[in-house]
Amino acid sequence: MFWKWCFRLSIVFVGLWLLLDLSSRLGAEIFWFQEVGYLQVFLLRLASRGALWVVAVGVTAVYLWGNLTLAQRLKYPRSLKIAEVRREEAELSVGLKNFLSPQYSLLNAPKIHDAGHLKPFRLRWLLPLTVVFSLLAGLILVHYGKIALAYWYPAFNKNSLPIITPFRLETIWELGRQVFSQVLYLGLIVGVAIAILIYSQFFLRAIAVILSVVFGTILFHNWAKVLQYFSPTPFNSTDPLFGKDISFYIFSLPLWELLELWLMGMFLYGFIAVTLTYLLSADSLSQGIFPGFSPQQQRHLYGMAGLLMLMVAFSYWLSRYELVYSPRGVSYGASYTDVVVQLPIYNILCVLGLAIAFYLLWRTIFWRAKSQYRQFVFYGLGVYLFVVVAAGSVLPTVVQYLIVQPNELQREQPYIQRTIALTRQAFSLETIDARTFNPQGNLTTAAIQANDLTIRNIRLWDKRPLLETNRQLQQFRPYYRFPDADIDRYTLEAEAAANRPVNPNQLPAPTERRQVLIAPRELDYSAVPEQAQTWINQHLIYTHGYGFTMSPVNTAGPGGLPEYFVKDIAGSNEGALSTSSEAVRDSIPIGQPRLYYGEITNTYVMTGTKVRELDYPSGSDNAYNAYDGLGGVIIGNGWRRGLFAMYLKDWQMLFTQDFLPETKVLFRRDVKQRIQAIAPFLKFDSDPYLVAADGSPAFPGQNNYLYWIVDAYTTSDRYPYSDPDNNGINYIRNSVKVVIDAYNGSVKFYIADATDPIIATWSAIFPQMFQPLSDMPVTLRSHIRYPLDYFGIQSERLMTYHMTDTQVFYNREDQWQIPNEIYGSESRPVEPYYLITSLPTVPFEEFLLLLPYTPKQRTNLIAWLAARSDGENYGKLLLYNFPKERLVFGPEQIEARINQDPVISQQISLWNRQGSRAIQGNLLVIPIEQSLLYVEPIYLEATQNSLPTLVRVVVAYENRIVMAQTLEQALQAIFQPEVTPAPAIIRPFEEVTPPG
């Protein structure tokens, strides 16, 4: 008795704990979404998730539990003597009033005894049947459990996206092969099968309960598909196979596949569980014989088999549309074999499946104990399975090998064209403006001076050496860290670059655009000394980062160190950041430089407490601050403190004496986690970047000028005929720009591509969540840029899908690749790079993202892709193709020429032998008018205590290469009129001893 009471109390305690934990999570989420202004978004998600979970769990539990309960009533009693079954055949008629009676099996045992017409199963058939069905039950449990686990713990699945594979007749073998190849899952399946054979009643019901929760979890996490289904936006484009609008594949088909996944698993397990209940009744395995299915058992199984066959037919109906994702053939999507052979087979299997399903259901409703057509059911199912195997798998393979492959181009040509066209649509490649670029080689000093803005913004500093230098010169304390540096452009007063060379033929402009590297100085609490890592320090004192550095990309200061427009923390001036000139101070807002939200800000903190927050170091002392921003949730001294202590599992919050009524907790301060929590249906760029600008009045708050901008994407893997990338995505748009206030934590979503149907659907679902891009403050809008991740995906697809001729595509004769470059001493692919320059035929400079291409397995340039980022031209792509009959040097060829030059290679070797290391930076290919200029910086760093310095700049043009101390000197050496063009390589002016 004592142990029973202990067990009951423990159950009550665990239940209360789970209830409190769930309540705290719900309450904290409500308060947090209220803080960021997206409570309605959260409540709609919560309601839809809750409804889906209840429906899935309820329907599954009722169906499985109800059928298992009915099977318990209809099964043979354990006391039945099977040896007495073989008697004279007797008619068995049992009324429906007894069919549902709990005492059915006992009341009708004598009749069952007399059912001599039943066909018994001997042990040689009974044992394999029960083992196979038990293994299938285990396979179902493991398969759907893996899917649910991948949703619940994304890290469980290496791709973070569970692959939904429904149980279909043609995929069961493949699923079994995959699962059985893993020892853990194999052991689990075998263990489940053995448990079912020994304790069938308990484990079959237990699995039913588990599957109910599993299906609830799967539907719970697929709430987005349901909401999209009810608010679709047409693409106004149809697929070439079925003529359906693309929106059917993006919004409708995923929901039908989700329903198939759920109902197929539910009906299949229900049929298996009920069959096992009957087969294992009457102690059949011990007696070595099963008397056969009674008429009412048959009626029950007919009904369940009818529902299962209905789902099989539905599955083949869906398989028809899934042919547009077929990998068979030379191109993605439905190929010749799929359209001519596989599609008719699926149509036939769908119709046959429906016919069998309706027949089984009709027999269930209008049951006759004896029927002359009963044997036709088994024959029909046998024929159906034969058609599935023979026609569904063997015939398409034979056609592919014997008919298609000998005449592949002729057969597949129209389908290749479909793949090309729809892949280009899905990745927005069809909007690329393709032009011819024929380098003239007539660049002069006058042309260089005319493109002065381009020259002044050639990037000599890469973010890697700059960050190394920042960490040495600008971190100040161990707990500060520069996690990243980002390229951007700012409009500065002309005085900001007084030392730059001036074109005498141009009047000085009142402002100029400068390309810069901006790096936030964030707080890294993990770098705080271990002895100081106390609860108060972590959550009350070390609360925020401070300021940023901003460096021009094209100049170096004394000793080759980077110059700074913005740097330091001027402790003598109330923590203001230092600027290089008054012009910079007037051009770049530097007030309120505190970073409470950032890329590595992953701790929760409490502000407005009795403890002062560390603000910034001031000499040998520290300055302190009290947060007065709009972020955070008030917890004070009341019940909210207990709620958040439970939510954060931080019990010291309950006992600290440092809280005040106005105390607030700031959590989810990592900008990517913050926006992911608000909009999990979007994909976000891997590189948030900091902007210093005045965001008022869109962002409330006083004197705050630091904002994070993150690009967000709408993606899909269901675009018909579109060849997916390496991540499985076959549709993507950069539809949203997200802005996060670095001080207040406010988040706003702006629609950057209103033509995208997916973002239009989400905007209809959450009408108050998104704003048009025109509502973004102009000061912030001037800093949006074409995102690197999006550009990388498009440029990768373009390597193949620039070929629009089907024969050229089939032969892959014009395949491109991204060239390699030498960075440091390692060869690596060229990364896209930002540049301020003017495009050919465009009379003004603009902020571009560039990437060169070379032919497959060759090193000469074949094309370069440019993405525009300024004003009305934002988002436009231009592709410049080089003439194939002329050699245009690629990055690898220029790198080889640099390293083969005896003077340059000798100097690099000399640096590498003096306790230092020479680093060859990014090689930039820069279009200027109708010519190409190649620029590569060379850095020098010590092997210990690395502090990279810019020591040389290499410039290549046509067949000339120069290495000099500065870019201006290198350009002068190449383009000065008095130098004759005879030498292939012009040597550097002087050999300068590297800094010691």
Curated annotation (Swiss-Prot):
Classification via Pfam families: UPF0182 (PF03699)
Compartments, record wording: Cell membrane
Topology of this chain in the membrane: Multi-pass membrane protein
Source taxon at top rank: Bacteria
Record keywords: Cell membrane, Membrane, Transmembrane, Transmembrane helix
Parts of the chain that traverse the membrane: 12-34, 51-71, 125-145, 183-203, 207-227, 261-281, 301-321, 339-359, 376-396
Cellular component terms per the entry's GO annotation: extracellular region; plasma membrane
Main location: membrane
UniProt KW Ligase keyword: no
Record's keyword annotation contains Cell membrane: yes
Family of this protein: Belongs to the UPF0182 family.
Name by which UniProt lists this protein: UPF0182 protein Ava_3693
Organism of this sequence: Trichormus variabilis (strain ATCC 29413 / PCC 7937) (Anabaena variabilis)
Taxonomic classification: Bacteria, Bacillati, Cyanobacteriota, Cyanophyceae, Nostocales
